[in-house]
Structure formats: structure tokens, C-alpha cells
Amino acid sequence: SPFALSKQVAGDFGGTRNGTVIHWPKRIQTGGGVRTQFSHVNDVAPTILEAANLPMPTMINGIPQIPMQGTSLLYTFDNPGAKERHNTQYFEIIGNRGIYHNGWMARTTVMYPWMAPKRMNTVAADDGWQLYDTTVDFSLSNDLAAQYPERLEAMKAKFMEEAIENQVL
């Protein structure tokens, strides 16, 4: 793969950037097309609901539902070059964290899956972070953290904002 790491390393596309095939001949007229907009597994349900013209559920069996995360991908079906709509996505697995925001990816890896668990779900101020511009660096190979320290700090703050809002930490 063009990616260095694996699924349990949140923020590495080796575990989070996977191909998807959607077949819907009555709607998608351009067979074999490729879409490059950022998407996440949490976009699947909103896409299916929009395609079926169904509302997001607010109550199921008398239980109020937490609003769904994700963005319908239907907009890409008719326009492969459409402007990206899923602009922010956080990642966290066993203390490894990442944040995608407007084409940039920041991540910190505190433990690799093949190591014995030393730190589970911890956040430390000294965790080293990397920064990547995914619009020109598909495989996350050119760390720009030293070149753009202000952007990295903003990305780290964005991760914390998303993590708190979504009860990750």
C-alpha cells in the first residue's frame, strides 16, 4: 500500500483510507468513475437515507437518537469533481489520534498495534504530532509540522474540540 501504517494507528490512511464501490446504474451514469472527496464510514448511513429519501431518525422505539455524524455522498454521484463537504473527521484508537480538516491531516502515534499496551486512551501534552497536506501528499509521507507550527497547533485544538464534543476522551 502507499501508506506506512495500519488500522489501529488512527490518523494513518493505511487503516482509514479504503476503496469503496457503489453500483447504482439508474443514478450514477458515469461507470468506473473515481471520487477523491474525503469521506468516512460514518457517511454511509446518511448516504443511504438520502438516496431512499428518508429522514434521519430522531426516535427509535421510544429512545431519542443522538444526531448522526457524517455527510451524504450523494452529491458526488452526479458530480465527480464536486467540492468536498465532509471537511472534518477525528480519529482515536488506543490513544493514537488524528484529525482531518479541510485537506490537512494531523496525527500522533503513541503506541503501535504490535507493541504491548502501555498507554491506553491517554492524552499527553508531549505526544509528538505530525502534519500533512493531503491535497499534495496522498500517502502522508512529508511531515510539515516544523514548517507550519501554527497550523499544527490549530489542528490539535480542533482534535480536542471534536473529541470533547463527541465524548471520545
Task: State where each predicted segment sits.
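Substrate-binding clefts and catalytic carboxylate motifs of secreted carbohydrate-active enzymes
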Residues: 153
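Type III/flagellar export substrates
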Residues: 161-163
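Conserved nucleotide-sugar donor-binding
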Residues: 22-25
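Active-site-proximal N-terminal segment of extracellular/periplasmic enzymes that hydrolyze or transfer
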Residues: 142-150
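Intrinsically disordered, low-complexity polar regions and short flexible loop motifs
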Residues: 137
